[in-house]
Amino acid sequence: MPPQQQRGRGRGRGPGGPGGPGGPGPEQAPEDPDRESGGERRRGRGRGAGRGGGDKAERAQAETEFQERVVQIRRVTKVVKGGKKLSFRAVIVVGDGNGRVGVGVGKANDVIGAVKKGVSDARKALIRVPLNKINSIPHPMSGSSGAANVFLKPASGGTGVIAGGAVRTVLELAGIKNVLAKSLGSKSPLNNARAAADALSRLRTLSEVAGERGVPVSNLWSR
């Protein structure tokens, strides 16, 4: 056998080679800091609430604060190449009764799916409504959506919600207790609900108006 091949064979476990007598021994894997002396892997012993546990609890609590009301469930038809496709459309209003309200629409092949989509859409369209001490709006305001127009006017304590249909649902879930409302134009529940939400989104407090004009709030009260 040539001397070069003999040297190549002797490198395996010969004297002084890796794994041989007097050699450095076989390569070992790096130690795992999470593995104990018995070979078992240590489990985490942190004191945290878990991965995302706190966020889930806060999200669940926020969901329970909102109330959901179905304004309308309607069967709709879409003409496609193969014929007519039937589905359901749900108009949903979501609010916490403390100044937050939203209007959403959902469409699906069944009623339950349409309601779920409507609730999700309404939560994405939440608006903040400024309320005064008697749970009324700070000033008159009007809103529109399509051919529907809604006019809102503040009322004194004990008046109640003078409104009907979808407009009343939006006002109640927003937490308004005393208000006068008038609907003009279209009688569509969806357009009336959106018109009411549009009017509420335009409301402003005295402090906001004073900040925009650069004057103290007392000047607005004197007028």
Swiss-Prot record:
GO CC, sorted alphabetically, is: ribosome; small ribosomal subunit
Q: Which residues form the S5 DRBM domain?
A: 66-129
- What PROSITE patterns does the annotation carry? RIBOSOMAL_S5 (PS00585), S5_DSRBD (PS50881)
Give the region (Disordered) as residue ranges: 1-66
One Pfam family in the UniProt entry: Ribosomal_S5
* Compositional bias of kind Basic and acidic residues: 53-66
The question of whether RNA-binding is a record keyword is answered with: yes
GO:BP terms for this protein?
translation
Instruction: Give the protein's biological function.
Output: With S4 and S12 plays an important role in translational accuracy.
Question: Subunit structure of this entry?
Answer: Part of the 30S ribosomal subunit. Contacts proteins S4 and S8.
Q: What is this protein called?
A: Small ribosomal subunit protein uS5
This chain's source organism reads Gloeobacter violaceus (strain ATCC 29082 / PCC 7421)
Name of the encoding gene: rpsE
